[in-house]
Amino acid sequence: MTLDVTGLDVELAGTRILDDVHASIRDGHLVGVVGPNGAGKSTLLRAMNGLITPTAGTVLVAGDDVHALSSAAASRRIATVPQDASVSFEFTVRQVVEMGRHPHTTRFGTDTDTAVVDRAMARTGVAQFAARDVTSLSGGERQRVLLARALAQAAPVLLLDEPTASLDVNHQIRTLEVVRDLADSEDRAVVAAIHDLDLAARYCDELVVVADGRVHDAGAPRSVLTPDTIRAAFDARVAVGTDPATGAVTVTPLPDRTSAAADTSVHVVGGGDSATPVVRRLVSAGASVSVGPVVEGDTDHETARRVGCPCTSVAPFTRLEDTTAASATRADIAAADVIAVPVAAAARPGVRGLLTGAVPTLAVGDAAGAPEWADRLVACDAVVSAVGALADTPSDGV
């Protein structure tokens, strides 16, 4: 059952909250809504489930305007897990979950309702709380109870507003695994406002980036979560890479500050794990960093991938001389303002032949003095200031 949002405008108390929002959620898909605080994510979900009447535009569920449906009819099609997990009355956990069956049942319920409620509680890990007063639970436990209530509602469309906000890491993963399974195995259309960009990228098929009440971008996580889009939507500087364990996009926030290396183009020669601390310091300082040559799968290679740096790699045991990687590295070096070479990396066969002296070069590490191929020798913790200074100083050649 598809959910289609077209030209949605929402004004509250004379303030425009949403402006011309378009989105389409298909069966079997989990769509994440991401954006900064106050962007309009919660308002969008409340308009989707009919709680807020839009100023303009439509929300169609299976072709019917959700705002024209009765409350019971809308609840049979759309279930919602709110951000606020507070419950005002002293119901037991089971009674709260049973409320999800109200759109489907008569006053007395059926054996089917009982089975659906039991399964929902087991699936969300709250069955052990069934007889407890829901107000006695922690915020995270209550959040899981509300998810169980939504599952018991058995609606083909599920909306979740920050479903992991009150949960510890274990239950964040468990909750999103349940939600992912609802889309995959039960073909539900799921929309979730998610604060954590890494979790959103890992579990969602598509992301909708909302900022200032508008959709800034929408699509697959890898196409949407780019440094430029995140900068525009969140006003944040980030590095975007790939998690080696999950293969999902990862977003690493970086300090937005001025440093000696800010906006300087630096090529870092790698090998093993020698370049990793250098790359991390330079990326955090705002430098534009490329890396290579590194060996595929080693620590420097994974670091470059995770922080989103362009990287030239070679297969293990490959001779560097006269390879495509050597040519690519020479091009990166020629385009850089400064080269940073860990002393250990310079010992790799073929690396010294890449250092022509045409670009100012830093040796990074411990040595008795600057090697003949470098303009300066610095410790790793001084590489940022050294890059800034050397970028303004012509190389003497080597």
UniProtKB/Swiss-Prot annotation:
Write down the EC number: 7.6.2.8
Recall the GO molecular function terms of this protein's record: ABC-type vitamin B12 transporter activity; ATP binding; ATP hydrolysis activity
Q: Which Pfam families match?
A: ABC_tran
Q: What is its main location?
A: membrane
Any idea where the ABC transporter domain is?
3-237
Q: Does the keyword Lipid biosynthesis apply?
A: no
Record SMART domains: AAA
- Subcellular localization: Cell membrane
Give the CC-aspect GO terms: plasma membrane
Question: Which UniProt keywords are present, listed alphabetically?
Answer: ATP-binding, Cell membrane, Membrane, Nucleotide-binding, Translocase, Transport
Q: How does it sit in the membrane?
A: Peripheral membrane protein
Residues annotated as binding ATP:
35-42
Give the catalytic activity.
an R-cob(III)alamin(out) + ATP + H2O = an R-cob(III)alamin(in) + ADP + phosphate + H(+)
What InterPro entries does UniProt report for this protein, alphabetically?
AAA+_ATPase, ABC_transporter-like_ATP-bd, ABC_transporter-like_CS, P-loop_NTPase
Keyword ATP-binding tagged: yes
**Recorded superkingdom:** Archaea
Concerning its family, UniProt says: Belongs to the ABC transporter superfamily.
What is the annotated role of this protein in its UniProt record?
Required for corrinoid utilization. Probably part of the ABC transporter complex BtuCDF involved in cobalamin (vitamin B12) import. Probably responsible for energy coupling to the transport system.
Question: Could you describe the subunit structure of this protein?
Answer: The complex is composed of two ATP-binding proteins (BtuD), two transmembrane proteins (BtuC) and a solute-binding protein (BtuF).
Q: What is this protein called?
A: Cobalamin import ATP-binding protein BtuD
